[in-house]
Amino acid sequence: AIPVFADIEDETFNLDPVSIRKNITNYTKAIVVPDIFGHPALLDEILEIASEYNLVVIEDCSQSPKARYKGKFAGTVGHIGVLSLNYHKHIHTGEGGICLTDDSSLAERMQLIRNHGEAVVEKKGVQDLTNMIGFNFRLGEIEASIGIEQFKKMDSLISDRIDKADKLREGLANLKGLRLPIVKDECTHVYYVFPILVDEDELGCSRDVVFNALVSEGVPIGNSYSTLHLLPMYQNKIAYGSKGFPWVSEIYKGKVKYDKGICPVAEELNDKRYMGIGMCSYEYSNKEIDSIIFAFKKVWDNIEILK
């Protein structure tokens, strides 16, 4: 597949349906929708576009398991839901992931693809597998067993992260030039990241100045989230081998650009406004959250010195 990138909206940082529509071509087969940072995307609008163009919606809820969207869990709204289980997610098994679907034909294809096109767990209805290219995407039994036990803890882990995020929100609420996480109506946020936007004009100094000051105070915060279209693989258009595949494939006659500027909202937020506190790599105590709030207030009390 050849990815075509749509821009994001700046409230929940998820894909912007308007940008998705602008980027659909005759070659488009699916829309991959990450539910980013812990908040579901604008899924009804995206599903409407998918229905109009007969596309599959693959909802990546790796950062948002158990988040709610209009009464449904993230990952169960699109045609397929996927979530990874590596070490910095809400729960983890070391490696591996999960696919969700209520479509039996899609489920069967995924079950075959995971193991070289073979039905190894249970008999499948597919009579002729000659058109099936399979891979080794098997999740080991040990990892699966760990995952089952981790799932039992998920509700309490997420509840604790929401409590800590609420405490952060309350503590940072009155600091000028900051926009704290937005939670849309009929949605819940499970805070894989506590995302913050800096308004440099209101604050009077740059995002990077306050970021560096916060890091100096020991705050576990980042100021970058990869803009994928600017990564070397897309800039050089070389993914497999050294000859430019898949972009040089004779099957693909379209044109795709990955120039800086095609996703202006994502680029501006990454370059000038975004900061984020990871909430899943470490289980914060209330005392540690208080320390983060104290560090923010200390930096803000000294903004004039930092300018």
Positions of predicted regions on the chain:
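A common structural junction motif
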Residues: 117-118, 215-221, 296-304
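Generic structural signal for small/hydrophobic residues in well-ordered secondary structure
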Residues: 20, 31, 35, 60, ...
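PLP-dependent enzyme catalytic core of the Aspartate aminotransferase-like
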Residues: 203, 236-307
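Conserved PLP-binding catalytic core of the aspartate aminotransferase-like
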Residues: 181-260
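PLP-dependent aminotransferase-like
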Residues: 1-61, 68
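Basic phosphate/pyrophosphate-binding loop/patch that engages nucleotide-derived ligands
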Residues: 24, 47-56, 93, 98-116, ...
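Active-site region of PLP-dependent enzymes
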Residues: 64-70, 74-193
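Structural detector of well-ordered beta-strand residues that form the stable sheet scaffold
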Residues: 4, 57-58, 82, 179-181, ...
